[in-house]
Amino acid sequence: AIMKYGVGVKCATITPNAARVDEYGLKKQWASPNGTIRGILDGTVFRAPILVNNVHPFVRTWTKPIHIGRHAYGDVYMNREIKVPGPGTGELVFTPRGGGEPIRKVIQEFESSGVLQGIHNTVPSIRSFAAACFTYAMDQTIDLWFSTKDTISKIYDAEFRRIFEEEYEANWKEKFEEAGIEYFFTLIDDAVARIMKSEGGMLWACKNYDGDVMSDMLASANGSLAMMTSVLVSPHGYFEYEAAHGTVQKHYYKHLEGETTSTNSMALIFAWTGCLKKRAELDETPEVGEFAKKIEEASIETVESGAMPGDLMRVADPDPKNRQVSTEEFIDCIREKLEEKL
């Protein structure tokens, strides 16, 4: 549907473990739906915090939003794994198409049982990731940080670094200098340390797994996993908007038992408004974009008025008007704010 219409919204999905296979009667432990979709669409996931004036970052130095650019293709999300049964040789083999001598590397001489994993990426996908990140940083007028571990991964991670530097020198260096922003590379562990001491205000470009982990850390440090926007920008012109969190399983089970839940729907609301704004841009229907903007404003104003779900209630600035509302009450409060704007 996204490939047909160009824009879509994806709700949270389950990547089943053994318990979920039994619970839902699945045929097997299916692969990650996100990984499958991103493998088809390719591209980069951009995430940014949803800011409200009564919830502040836990990191005191962060005075500007930190954006994440996560490569959405390959690596561990499209891996192949082997459970090694016993002693033997684990090899990495590449067989050229159309003939030629295979390239072989011994990974490990196993003396016992163990595990093996193969991952991959492609130069075109890495290049589109780099181009998307430079474009995003230029559009937002913010610095671009990129981090890998090329001191350890001297071919795999080093290829990412090489392509980013090549893209910067060939297409972006002069533009960045004119805009007063910079491209900065450092190792992933050093980047984490620097981020924690920074004032924010940059796009942090990460490989797939790094971006998966760090985007959740940033969202939580800004108040909640539900306080972050997320959009997959495909090099083929597709846009997939989603909530950056999971299925909120514990809340769902409470709901099934008839208990009242207080679930934060901000990320899902902003997924839909982001989609509507992109649809308005493509269809040249500005009134649709204005409607989406008013929904976002109503959502933020609701939280700032003191009506908020439990996750924000625990981290919001103390105020007598603060009150925890249920899942449905929160949506009703947003609706009331929206109706005032229409």
Describe every region a protein language model picked out.
Residues 1-102, 209-213:
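N-terminal glycine-rich phosphate/adenylate-binding segment common to multiple enzyme folds
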Residues 72-74, 78-130, 285, 293-342:
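Glycine-rich phosphate/pyrophosphate-binding loop and the adjoining helix
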Residues 92-186:
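Glycine-rich phosphate/diphosphate-binding loop of Rossmann-like nucleotide-binding domains
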Residues 139-148, 172-185, 280-292, 302-315:
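Flexible, glycine/charged-enriched surface loops at secondary-structure junctions
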Residues 154-165, 195-203, 209, 219, ...:
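Short glycine/threonine-rich loop-to-helix capping motif typified by GTGT followed
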Residues 186-193:
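Short acidic loop-to-helix transition motifs that present clustered carboxylates
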Residues 195-294, 298-305:
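Glycine-rich phosphate/nucleotide-binding loop
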